[in-house]
From Swiss-Prot:
Entry's Gene Ontology cellular component terms: extracellular region
Coiled-coil portions: none
Domain of life of the source: Eukaryota
Source organism of the structure: Conus ventricosus (Mediterranean cone)
Signal sequence extent: 1-18
Name the UniProt record assigns to this protein: Conotoxin VnMEKL-012
GO molecular function: ion channel inhibitor activity; toxin activity
Native organism taxonomy: Eukaryota, Metazoa, Spiralia, Lophotrochozoa, Mollusca
InterPro entries assigned to the protein according to its UniProt record, in alphabetical order: Conotoxin
Domain notes per entry: The presence of a 'disulfide through disulfide knot' structurally defines this protein as a knottin. The cysteine framework is VI/VII (C-C-CC-C-C).
């Protein structure tokens, strides 16, 4: 009887571990997809960005490069 209970507990623990490990793989893949998409969008934005002392006002509003801020002109 005790041996049967021990086997059942071991089986439950092993199946729980397998489920947790499988979910970890899914979340790792999702994380990689998210980071890849974010990197690609950042690269796309850098192509469209304007550099230092470029006009970025309300009528013509291209994004400043990530290290600049826009206050009518991109500035550090």
């Amino acid at each position: 009887m005790k041996l049967t209970i021990l086997f059942l507990v071991a089986a439950v623990l092993m199946s729980t571990q397998a489920l947790i490990q499988h979910d970890g793989e899914k979340s790792q893949k999702a994380k990689m997809k998210f980071l890849t998409a974010r990197t690609l969008s950042a690269k796309k934005r850098d192509v469209d960005c304007v550099g230092w002392s470029s006009y970025c006002g309300p009528w013509n509003n291209p994004p400043c490069c990530s290290w600049y801020t826009c206050d009518y002109y991109c500035k550090l």
